[in-house]
Amino acid sequence: MPCQHDCEIVISHLMKLKLISCEIFYREFNAVIARSPHLVDAEFLPKGLHDIGTARMRDRIQAAIDGIKDFSYDAILIGYGLCNNGVVGLTSRDRPLIIPRAHDCITLFLGSKERYLDYFQNNPGVYFETTGWIERGTASGELSQLTVGSKLKMQQSFEDLVRRYGEDNARHLWEQIGNPEKQYRKITFIEMGIEPNDSFETAAREKAETRNWKFEKLAGSIGLFQRLVNGGWNDAEFLLVPPGCRVAATYDNGIIGIEKA
């Protein structure tokens, strides 16, 4: 059912905004929040949410939204892309949500969905690295027990699979889902301009060398991050979700839309 887009945010000299974001963006958002004209409180959720399945990921983000008790916020900023439909269904009872029109986090790192599509189509088999993935890319604690890989018992060696399933079945499982790196041929390190030194690039380069993959350094863009925390959200880049509506996938160039909650 369509959701009437009758919500309007009055952009004042100073707004109070709440950001809920994946921790992969920790350095980028902290850098742009320092330059925002508004008061922005940030809450970062574990990267491992991407690995526990769409429904659980959405539930954890929704719980963070529902847990906001400060009613003085003008809007809630969502630091996620569509991310395997992990934001589909998100809603807020009393404040609008602002979400980037992004396929996934690569869109934010590259600065636009158009640049993302162009690079994706011309560079198959790419494994991306940024500061966030390098220093925060491994699930731990509770989330490590909920990851899809753990649930399927694929975080083990080929020999373990042979003992459990027999050689023929183990070989099939390993080829299908037990060896996720088989689809990659290159590591692309996205340089965002917020790196303290070249240690992250070096780590990405060494990872490529150990796998005999190609390596590329690509200039990212901080622009989408900055525009999200600056306000004045244009419809081409951001979706405004009024209270009582929820996020829906549109499967078109807009990526996400709204429907009645």
Language model feature labels by segment:
Residues 3, 7, 13-36:
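N-terminal basic/disordered segments at the start of proteins
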Residues 20-27, 76-88, 103-105, 133-136, ...:
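Gly/Ser/Thr-rich loops at beta-strand to alpha-helix junctions
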Residues 39-55, 217-221:
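A short beta-strand-loop structural module common to alpha/beta enzyme folds
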Residues 55-67:
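Glycine-rich, highly charged phosphate/nucleotide-binding loops
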Residues 64-116:
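N-terminal glycine-rich phosphate/adenylate-binding segment common to multiple enzyme folds
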Residues 95-143:
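Long, charge-dense
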Residues 122-198:
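A conserved mid-domain beta-alpha-beta active-site/ligand-binding segment of alpha/beta enzyme cores
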Residues 167-261:
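Extended, basic/helix-rich recognition subdomains
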